Structure formats: C-alpha cells, structure tokens
Amino acid sequence: MERHERAVARIRQGHVDLLFIGDSITQGWEEDGRPVWDIFYQHRHAANLGYNGDQTDNVLWRLQHGELDGITPKLAVVMIGTNNATRREDPPEETAAGIQAILATLRTRLPDTKILLLAVFPRGLSADDRLRQINNAVNERLPAMADQRQVFFLNLNRRFLDNNGGLPEEIM
C-alpha cells in the first residue's frame, strides 16, 4: 500500500502528461532504469504506476482508488498481464478481459487521453515455453481492443528476442 499511497500523492500534485501503467517491468524505470527515466520521461511530467507482481485486477483496483483522480494526461502507456500467467495461471481470455476492463476504465475516466497498449512481454527463455505461449495467446486478442482513435496497440516483443525466438537471460 505504501507505493500506492506515494502514487496517489504524486497524482494529487497534478501536471501529469504521461502515465505509465503496469507491473515490475514498468516499475523498473524508477529503479535500474532510473537514468533513462530521468533523461527521457521526467521532463515530460511522467508518473509511473508500475507495481512489482501486479496483475490486471490489481491495476484495476488502483485505477479506481485514486490513481486517476484529477489528472488529464496526454498519453497513458499500458503493459500488463504477464503476472496473470505466472502467479495464478489465468487462461488467456481472462487476462485479456482484465486488460479490456483496464482500457474501459481509462476510456471512461480519461476520455481525452490517448492510450498506447503494449503487448504482454514474453516469458520464458524459448519460444515453446508454456508461459510464453499463454502470453502470446493474450497478445493475439489485444489488437482488437485498439480503435485507432483513442487506443493504439504496439507489439515490440520481437525486438527483445533472438533469431530463434529465444529471450536472452540478461533481459529476463
């Protein structure tokens, strides 16, 4: 709850133009990624709503409990869902439904904000890893959620994979 309370305090300060919503990958921009965050995002009045271990229902709860109050960011970047596969082994359709609920909340609460939905990041070292397959199945459902007016979808996953579809250990 401490991180949530800090996030709500940051939101209450206002002047949030760029919002990042996600799990530990997003939270990492405030940790190991801090130098990059400071150079590229801090001056853009960015707020980081990434939480280690987060699943779609955790994000939804926080968005409904203060993390969107009183702000009108220009852009919200959303990448969430990989922990649904690992922590609870949610089926892809449930994870996709959770992402859809997050998008619906953002559309309703932030009607003037553009939303960039990123593909769920790949898991597992190899292309045939069971968790990778679950995340791939979620990602197959995400483009249909983008209306190309307010919500846009982008899959950057290939940039992180080697020629055989493997995910290098240093990225994990």
Predicted features and spans:
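Surface-exposed cleft-lining segments at the edges of enzyme active sites
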Residues: 48-51, 82-95, 125-130
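Structural recognition of the beta-strand scaffold that forms the well-ordered cores
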Residues: 17-22, 45-50, 74-80, 114-119, ...
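Feature marks short, surface-exposed loop/turn motifs that line or immediately flank catalytic pockets
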Residues: 28, 55, 83-86, 124, ...
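Glycine-rich anion/phosphate-binding loops
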Residues: 54-61, 91-100
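Generic structural signal for well-ordered alpha-helices
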Residues: 99-104, 139-143
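Proline-centered flexible-loop/turn and helix-kink motifs
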Residues: 42, 111-112
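Serine-esterase "nucleophile elbow" of acetyl-processing enzymes
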Residues: 1-72
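Catalytic His-Asp segment of secreted/periplasmic serine-dependent ester chemistry enzymes
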Residues: 122-172
